[in-house]
Amino acid sequence: MLLAAVLMVVVIIKRARRRLNGAATKRIRSMIERADRAGEPVLRVLEYDKVLDHLLLELGFTGTTGQKMIKGAARFSNKQALWKCHKLRNLVAHEHGATVSASEADHFKRVLEKALLEVSSRS
């Protein structure tokens, strides 16, 4: 019984990593660079949100992007900004005719990069 409890704790700790390793950080930075080339601001926002989802997945969180953000919110000092960016993505994904300015897309990128910096290994 004790062994099962210890194993469960180890699995939970491994699933919700504290920091991303260098390889994971590099993959996510590469995804951000690809998202930069998506062109129109609305497309960049959609791509940046996919990167956010992948970042949360790499940290060990599961579910929809929103569920992952709820589980991982405490990990980020800019959690409110991350939520605002995800809500912008939801707006453009679900509202016909929704538009995004270049500055809004650029803001999403900056928020995402700050979040990545906070959870990346310091090496």
Locate the predicted segments by residue.
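Amphipathic alpha-helical interface elements
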Residues: 1-72, 76-80, 106, 110-111, ...
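Broad hydrophobic/π-residue packing in well-ordered secondary structure
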Residues: 32, 94-98, 112
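Histidine-centered, metal-coordinating catalytic motifs and their short helical/loop contexts
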Residues: 75-102
